[in-house]
């Protein structure tokens, strides 16, 4: 669901699909962390250079795809690493437009299911967790997933609405240093109470190798924390230059799969809040109205500070 290094976590989870004999295509959001791209916020399609259009909200990159400022996207680096195309999503026009774009891309690629994966578990946040730092992107993308799940993403090929399967996933609970492992577990019990939890999968040695190899091409800390958990490490590890701390536990080696539509009634309040938004800014304002500060606020504050 995120940008930056989240695509590495998605690659780790793809190992499950390999074991099931299922073909897959990776994707991610055109939004790099501020140390990589100092310009705040995600990039729109008009701000992406390279790649080929794939639906109305994405481009397919095979490498060398950058912002207009020359910043190469993590998804582009992943495509070069894998030697296969990766999808790059524009989330700036809000959940409904993104859902249509994802449905169009899924049809073009021949995908009959979409898995929206969050690294860390902040997509399940309530908004009052002390460590929560990046709720906006995840909430907006999962809100697009709700449109998909409800058949509300209409395309030229599917005028009655796209009818593929839609799953949510949390990879490496607590591994981004935002929600603690205990907080993520509390949110998982909310999924269970809503009959929304579908299953759990643990990182295999092969999946760990995939993540470690990809992380040499695509900078990431959170996705690698899950590997360290799977390798049996324990303890507290600082990330983000010491601004966050990850507690390495067995929980971090797991990926939880859930039904977003079933969760929408009670377990994903931030996603529900941004669902009506017609743009990224409206989604941001919806969370701000709940008293939830987002990654966009943090990036804008950093950018303003660098220009003072």
Predicted region positions:
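Conserved phosphate- and dinucleotide-binding cores of soluble alpha/beta proteins
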Residues: 122-167, 172-189
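A glycine-rich helix N-cap at a beta->alpha junction
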Residues: 45-69, 188-217
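Short, glycine-rich nucleotide/cofactor-binding loops
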Residues: 1-8, 130-131
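Internal, conserved structured core segments that host functional sites
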Residues: 81-148
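Histidine-anchored nucleotide/phosphate-binding helix
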Residues: 7-22, 26, 138-147
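Cap/lid and interdomain-hinge subdomains that line or gate substrate/regulatory clefts
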Residues: 59-99, 105, 153-162, 166-173
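C-terminal accessory domains and tails appended to enzymatic cores
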Residues: 218-308
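Glycine-rich nucleotide/cofactor/substrate-binding loop typically near the N-terminus or early
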Residues: 18, 24-88
């Amino acid at each position: 669901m995120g940008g930056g290094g989240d695509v590495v976590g998605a690659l780790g989870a793809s190992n499950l699909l390999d074991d099931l004999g299922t073909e897959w295509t990776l994707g991610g959001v055109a939004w790099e962390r501020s140390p990589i791209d100092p310009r705040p916020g995600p990039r729109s399609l008009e701000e992406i250079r390279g790649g080929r259009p794939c639906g109305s909200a994405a481009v397919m990159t095979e490498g060398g795809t950058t912002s207009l400022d020359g910043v190469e996207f993590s998804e582009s680096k992943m495509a070069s690493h894998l030697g296969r195309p990766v999808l790059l999503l524009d989330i700036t026009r809000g959940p409904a437009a993104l859902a249509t774009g994802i449905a169009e891309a899924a049809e073009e690629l021949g995908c009959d299911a979409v898995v929206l994966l969050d690294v860390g578990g902040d997509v399940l946040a309530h908004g009052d967790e002390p460590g929560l730092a990046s709720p906006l992107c995840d909430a907006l993308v999962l809100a697009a997933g709700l449109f998909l799940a409800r058949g509300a993403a209409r395309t030229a090929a599917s005028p009655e609405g796209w009818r593929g399967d839609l799953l949510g996933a949390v990879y490496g609970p607590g591994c981004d240093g935002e929600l603690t492992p205990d907080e993520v577990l509390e949110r998982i019990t909310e999924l269970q109470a809503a009959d929304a939890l579908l299953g759990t999968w643990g990182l295999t040695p092969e999946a760990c190798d995939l993540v470690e190899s990809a992380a040499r091409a695509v900078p990431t800390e959170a996705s690698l924390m899950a590997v360290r958990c799977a390798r049996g490490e324990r303890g507290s590890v600082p990330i983000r230059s010491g601004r966050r701390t990850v507690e390495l536990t067995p929980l971090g080696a797991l990926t939880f799969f859930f039904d977003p539509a079933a969760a929408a009634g009670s377990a994903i309040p931030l996603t529900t809040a941004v669902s009506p938004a017609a743009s990224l800014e409206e989604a941001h304002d919806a969370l701000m109205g709940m008293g939830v500060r987002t990654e966009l606020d943090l990036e804008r504050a950093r950018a303003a500070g660098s220009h003072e």
